[in-house]
Amino acid sequence: MLNFSDISYAERGMVATINSNRLKDKGVGQYQNAYNYKNQNFEDLRASCLKMGELFEDPFFPAEPQSIGFKELGPKSQEVHNVYWQRPKDIIHNPQFITNDFSPTDICQGILGDCWLLAAIGSLTTSPKLLFRVVPRSQSFKKNYAGIFHFQLWQFGHWLNVVVDDRLPTKNNKLVFVHASHRQEFWGALLEKAYAKLNGSYEALTGGSTMEGLEDFTGGMAQCIRLQNPPHNLLRLLRKALEKSSLMGCSIEVTNSDDVEKMAHNMLVKGHAYAITGLQDVYYRDKLETLIRIQNPWGRIEWNGAWSDKAKEWEEVMPEVQMQLLHKKEDGEFWMSYEDFMSNFTLLEICNLTPDALSSWDYKSCWHTTFFEGSWRRGSTAGGCRNYPETFWSNPQFRISLPETDDPEDSSDKSEMVCTCLVALMQKNWRHAREGPQLLTIGFVVFSVWYVQFQNLQDIHLKKDFFMKYRDHGFSEIFTNTREVNSHLRLPPGEYVIIPSTFEPHKDADFLLRVFTEKHSETWLLDEVNMLEQLQEETITDADLDQNSVELFETLANRDSQVDMYDLQKLLNKMSSKVKSFKSKGFSLDVCRRMVNLMDKDDSGKLGLHEFHILWKKIKKWMEIFKECDQDRSGNLNSYEMRLAIEKAGIRMNNRVTEVVVARYADANMIVDFDNFINCFLRLKAMFAFFLSMDTKKTGSICLNINQWLHITMWG
């Protein structure tokens, strides 16, 4: 019996994509119906362990060196020397999963450089509703304990249920990585382990932004604001973000690697991720002072300036305010003035939440959200940025309609009628490739277009001439080598096209494009519909027959005046060699078989004289299309030209089909000769013909049994 492992990687990818899309259509991947990561079902695994009287051991993230790291934390590293994996019950008496008095200061950083992740976790603890979406609180080390725990994490548009065992790396009976400020609590360490499993290893978590962690814990969209040049309404944005239960982080960026996690005289750490946990106005010296509360994920080392724990400013505020806000202990959490915040920090990150993460009373503050998964594939859909006009048009394209303006900040202000639109482009799975490829430089361009330009363009992939004509309409061109690139846009109502791309062409990657708007909007993929155009069939009369070709046909034909695919190959190669204006290496036997299939009307497997001449007429037309699309007159097509040539010949393909076609018929340099062009075109034409002949009710779908499927795919 054929196993899934017998299928090629490319075929597995196609099957996986189809199955994934089917599950997505059923709602799998939403928070309420998360995917089981690695197909591991928590309830089933726990029940099995309880029945067998065993503690769970995760085969997909084993208690072995490769789960810890591969380079700085690799098996030969001193950092992991004498590291042992232990379960909490073996580390301490009466371990607790989570206690009721959790706070941002519960979680402390270990030897791993993932302060960005801890800052995100710290922000998460300020909202129990969000925390318990990620950390199901019904778990414990007592009732139904089987050494297995699970967490809900968001990855690239989908929620995943990630299972881990509770074996944790320790040294001298102490946790090596994340640990609680009081040793009995283990939810933070196990959450870090689940996140490490999702990304391949603990070391894969080294270096990142708080924004990344916030998004993966909430499914929200993060904004990045440079505080050297802040928006004029930044304080209002901060207040609004806290009102919406948004999660926030801040940091002091460094330009010199030697300054990373270097402490300034005021005890702020450069290149270190902090969480913003509150905002408060207090009366100080007869005026209102805005304070901002910040938390250091280390659980220690606090700001020592104005409004710090021991600062004299607290002596001049009301005692009840002191009691409410001031906690004099070394817990990593501190207050500072808004002015000092702006003077010291350089980067602010805000994670805007999706509707499902908000309470019902927050409905008015919900964003309208849309997301698309896509890919860039070398030779087909990886066209690069606008610096490469010959291929830029081949990138995936998305149309957005913004018909409704935001509510004005002041009901009396009608001067600025705009639509707030957050656009974010994320590249997938880059942490999994830490030992190989790194982050690509990605970005997007937004084109403003008139509605009239889009009439009758619902299902058409815009071509090069469109972008050359409307080149000046493109804006918001941002390219960086980060996991995500985003932009906070305030646009007039209208129609727009978003083009996500890598900076350079021919770079393979998968991406997620998300659009958040304050008001109703419509966003969809702008792509071709797979379609075979009904072109007029060629006919031929006796007067059209060329005497030389007739004689050549008769010398190769059998006694019935017909040629099979072997004779057809000889015939076509002789005739094409006489076409001096056309360069060809000859026709392969596979192409000749497809031609016989296309033209054979009586199922004889052979062609008669008239059938052959109609075929030759078609071939000459295909030669003209090939030459027309061969812009550099090289005698071959590049893969982008092939797509245009196939369209001119009567077949429109969407991006997914184009990616498969290029992978199958282009060579290593993305070049397609005439034989492969014809082979591809005839295969597509045959598959369309099979499908349309069986889809008698024009439903767009057919049902086949295994015999029919094999017959069509093997003969097509």
UniProtKB/Swiss-Prot annotation:
It comes from the Eukaryota. One of its GO terms (cellular component) is acrosomal vesicle. Residues 55-354 form the Calpain catalytic domain. Its EC number is 3.4.22.-. The keyword Nucleotide-binding does not apply. Calcium-regulated non-lysosomal thiol-protease which catalyzes limited proteolysis of substrates involved in cytoskeletal remodeling and signal transduction. Pfam families: Calpain_III (PF01067), Peptidase_C2 (PF00648). Ca(2+) 1 binds at D600, D602, S604, K606, E611. The active site is at C115, H272, N296. Keywords: Calcium, Cytoplasmic vesicle, Hydrolase, Metal-binding, Protease, Repeat, Thiol protease. Residues 545-715 are annotated as: Domain IV. It is found in: Cytoplasmic vesicle, Secretory vesicle, Acrosome. One of its GO terms (biological process) is proteolysis. Gene3D superfamilies: 2.60.120.380, Cysteine proteinases, EF-hand. This is Calpain 11. Residues 587-613, 617-652 form the EF-hand domain. Ca(2+) 2 binds at D630, D632, S634, N636, E641. Its main location: cytoplasm. Residues 529-544 are annotated as: Linker. Heterodimer of a large (catalytic) and a small (regulatory) subunit. Residues 355-528 are annotated as: Domain III.
